[in-house]
């Protein structure tokens, strides 16, 4: 990619990577489509998983789909739930990440516009976007770049510190209180650059193991008089509306693999037909 502007900026950067995606689906007897998918990403093809690993993953996907095809359909439910690590990543990207993109704070998408300096997450949470990270915890990251699509040098943006909202992701288009770009002007498909997420990282100073989260889920379900809570193991991006142009401020994330966690100790039960919907307010 080549970038030149009247400020005298000249940027040449190449971005090559390898990605393999596996998708499979089955149809239940009632006609419900049941998709599952996975992907592998690396900047060098030699760092992709072995063929044996990917074949084993594909076979496991078929086994899970076979069970999912015969799983019960859920009823409407309001109650406690927990998300796996990968599912939490999608959740934060859709529900939180899009609402800290500066251009969305104009024209009605103002969920957090007046929340700067206020507590928006638990005090042990830190959220930042860092396009300079090529990997994190041993995983290569797709959001890595050195300069954004407006020629601005990439940098880490600490969006939330100790639960308090500090900053938004900015392109060259200013926002009240945030007059300058912080290296997040991005484009796709030849469109105009807008402020978009890079590598969104969510950290906590008070982490819990999966076993601890399950125990907390069961206790909360008991408090609410529920027979079970839900565990979202795998989800895929749905859509989010941020209130721009008068649209409803809402989100819809598509769960692919969801389990009922029973409070009486029964085995976890795979279910289908789940939608994860709501508003961020």
What are these regions (language model features)?
Residues 1-156, 161-164, 177, 225-227, ...:
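Active-site bordering "gate/hinge" segments
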Residues 115-281:
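Dual-mode signal for accessory low-complexity, basic/Gly-rich regions
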């Amino acid at each position: 990619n080549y970038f030149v502007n009247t400020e005298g900026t000249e940027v040449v950067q190449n971005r090559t990577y390898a990605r393999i995606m596996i998708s499979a689906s089955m149809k239940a007897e009632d006609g419900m489509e049941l998709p599952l998918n996975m992907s592998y990403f690396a900047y060098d093809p030699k760092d992709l998983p072995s063929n044996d690993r990917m074949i084993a993953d594909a076979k496991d996907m078929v086994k899970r789909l076979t069970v999912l095809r015969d799983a019960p359909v859920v009823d409407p439910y309001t109650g406690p739930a927990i998300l796996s690590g990968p599912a939490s990543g999608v959740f934060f990207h859709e529900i939180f990440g899009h609402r800290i993109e500066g251009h969305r704070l104009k024209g009605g998408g103002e969920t957090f516009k007046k929340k700067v300096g206020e507590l928006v997450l638990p005090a042990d949470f830190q959220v930042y976007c860092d396009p300079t990270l090529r990997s994190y915890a041993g995983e290569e990251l797709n959001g890595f770049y050195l300069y954004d699509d407006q020629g601005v040098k990439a940098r880490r943006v600490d969006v939330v510190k100790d639960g308090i909202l500090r900053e938004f992701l900015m392109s060259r288009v200013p926002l009240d209180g945030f007059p300058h770009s912080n290296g997040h002007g991005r484009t796709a498909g030849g469109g105009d650059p807008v402020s978009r997420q890079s590598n969104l990282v969510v950290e906590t100073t008070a982490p819990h193991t999966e076993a601890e989260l399950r125990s907390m889920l069961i206790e909360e379900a008991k408090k609410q008089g529920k027979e079970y809570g839900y565990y979202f193991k795998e989800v895929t991006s749905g859509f989010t509306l941020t209130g721009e142009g008068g649209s409803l401020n809402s989100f819809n994330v598509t769960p692919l693999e969801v389990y009922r966690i029973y409070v009486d100790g029964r085995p976890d039960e795979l279910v289908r037909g789940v939608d994860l919907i709501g508003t961020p307010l």
